[in-house]
């Protein structure tokens, strides 16, 4: 997590060898109310602080919601995007996007969990998310 700060990030990077280190920004289950309560900041302010840290650090990439991708077009790091939902769901994910939308916004990798792991037909569910 980028919240661990620069020292933690650099320690992880120096111990990683050839392994890529990704910094998690804000969880896709958080919204404006959550970030205000947890950090005393607006969502955008907290996200900007974490991304600034990512830019200044040696992380190889970031993990962020698809909704924040549009603000990261100039970030030359790997972008891993959870919160992918091709259909409307009633779960804890608050900032979601379809797989096609996420790739169009600049995602390098997407993360799809429950829509696949809890599907009746896992193979069909996987096919649904392939772009």
Go through each PLM region and give its residues:
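Glycine-rich phosphate-binding active-site loops on the catalytic face of alpha/beta enzymes
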Residues: 1-8, 92-125
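Short, electropositive alpha-helical surface patch
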Residues: 75-83, 123-131
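Short, cationic motifs built from Arg/Lys/His that form the positively charged side of catalytic pockets
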Residues: 83-85, 117
């Amino acid at each position: 997590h980028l919240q661990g700060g620069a020292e933690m990030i650099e320690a992880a990077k120096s111990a990683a060898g050839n392994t890529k280190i990704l910094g998690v920004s804000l969880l896709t289950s958080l919204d404006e109310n959550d970030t205000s309560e947890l950090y005393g900041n607006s969502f955008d302010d907290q996200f900007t602080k974490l991304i600034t840290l990512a830019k200044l650090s040696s992380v190889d990439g970031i993990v962020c919601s698809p909704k924040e991708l549009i603000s990261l077009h100039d970030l030359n790091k790997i972008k891993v995007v959870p919160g992918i939902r091709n259909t409307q769901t009633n779960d804890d994910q608050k900032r979601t996007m379809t797989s096609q939308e996420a790739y169009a916004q600049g995602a390098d990798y997407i993360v799809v969990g429950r829509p696949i792991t809890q599907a009746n037909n896992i193979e069909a569910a996987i096919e649904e998310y392939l772009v």
